[in-house]
């Protein structure tokens, strides 16, 4: 529910080359993505300068109690795949889950060549 923290954790993940499996939920919808040293990052997908930090928040918009449970389950499953089998099916992909239709979509996204986080991690690594 805190976009500033999402951007800070993303930057730390890239700088330290520590994988990040990020999840979020609002209303009936959820998102899940994975960031690692070689992949596109959270800021590539959601550029900070284009993001309205006063956007949707669960406190104002609400969230169905089961939505975070579903997204957390997907996040835990993906984490176990990564840690146990070294699989990362969501690397540079965004999983969108819709709790009204019970459908999910997976969108591929590329590194943004102008992303300040990815550029900074190149100079560190």
Residue locations for each model-derived region?
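Glycine-rich phosphate/adenylate-binding loop
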Residues: 1-125
């Amino acid at each position: 529910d805190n976009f500033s923290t999402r951007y800070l954790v993303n930057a730390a993940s890239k700088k330290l080359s520590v994988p990040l499996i990020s999840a979020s939920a609002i209303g009936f919808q959820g998102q899940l993505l994975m960031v690692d040293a070689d992949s596109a990052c959270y800021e590539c997908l959601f550029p900070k300068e284009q993001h309205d930090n006063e956007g949707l928040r669960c406190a104002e918009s609400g969230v169905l109690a089961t939505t975070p449970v579903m997204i957390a389950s997907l996040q835990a499953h993906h984490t176990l795949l990564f840690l146990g089998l070294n699989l990362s099916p969501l690397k540079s992909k965004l999983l969108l889950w819709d709790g009204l239709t019970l459908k999910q979509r997976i969108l591929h996204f590329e590194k943004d060549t102008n992303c300040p986080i990815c550029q900074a991690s190149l100079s560190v690594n």
